[in-house]
Amino acid sequence: MAVGTSALSKEPWWTLPENFHSPMVFHMEEDQEELIFGLDDTYLRCIELHSHTLIQLERCFTATGQTRVTVVGPPMAKQWLLLMFHCVGSQDSKCHARGLKMLERVRSQPLTNDDLVTSVSLPPYTGD
């Protein structure tokens, strides 16, 4: 995205076809899913609303109890969530703390363009 362009459109994100072109799909451990989305996915809807995304959780019947996570929405919002998911699951205490702070942010209030731009401008974490 070019500097000076808006990360979040003034139009509802779900009305823009480009937000559905490249869904983000990955697997998450069951305990991490519960930490992020809460017991019985209590926080799923508010995370979707606050991150301007749609998140689908599909429990997989595997030995490790993984969940397939599919996210659609504005590219920078998906990138922000991916960073948050990574940090929450990190073994590094600083990265994990950063992820928990991001999680509290997205649970408590809508993400702003500043949130999205700030998170993608941070240096990538390479400690895991």
UniProtKB/Swiss-Prot annotation:
GO terms for molecular function: RNA binding. Pfam families: MOEP19. This is KHDC1-like protein. One of its GO terms (cellular component) is cytoplasm. Signal peptide: none annotated. Gene3D superfamilies: K Homology domain, type 1. Belongs to the KHDC1 family.
